[in-house]
């Protein structure tokens, strides 16, 4: 049985980034974790992923933070190898920690779209076909270790 956090992160990796390079898949995971650590978002990984307006108990199509969650399709991975890979990435990121190479990014989008919010954020990096952004400039990198439930700033 999968840990709930790992399960949510793995689905997000699978549906948002399974066609991305490994560092792109980790970066998508980092965005969720950066949101969890940001007071503007929920401190719950699954709630961050599922954030968006609902109607009659269901997410409104096209209005979620992560598009796969409210696209109207079943959220069941078809490619089991890619899903197992996503589980492994989610587990490693949570268990082993990482240097935040998206530098605090809380947003990203595919490079073939230009959402209005992107002009109001600081562009950080492009990985694969995703462009990552953060709210504002910051000086420190963050290391996150789920196992110890701690966030350490490192300059």
Residue ranges and their predicted role:
Residues 4-155:
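Bacterial extracytoplasmic/cell-wall-associated proteins, especially those involved in peptidoglycan
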């Amino acid at each position: 049985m999968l840990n709930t956090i790992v399960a949510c992160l793995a689905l997000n990796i699978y549906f948002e980034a399974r066609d991305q390079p490994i560092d792109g898949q980790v970066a998508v995971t980092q965005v969720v974790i950066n949101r969890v650590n940001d007071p503007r978002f929920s401190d719950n990984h699954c709630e961050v992923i599922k954030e968006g307006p609902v109607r009659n108990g269901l997410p409104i199509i096209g209005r979620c933070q992560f598009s796969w969650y409210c696209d109207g399709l079943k959220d069941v991975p078809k490619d089991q190898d890619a899903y197992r890979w996503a589980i492994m990435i989610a587990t490693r990121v949570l268990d082993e920690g990482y240097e935040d190479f998206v530098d605090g990014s809380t947003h990203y989008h595919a490079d073939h779209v230009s959402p209005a919010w992107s002009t109001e954020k600081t562009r950080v990096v492009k990985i694969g076909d995703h462009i990552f952004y953060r709210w504002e400039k910051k000086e420190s990198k963050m290391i996150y270790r789920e196992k110890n439930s701690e966030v350490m700033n490192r300059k």
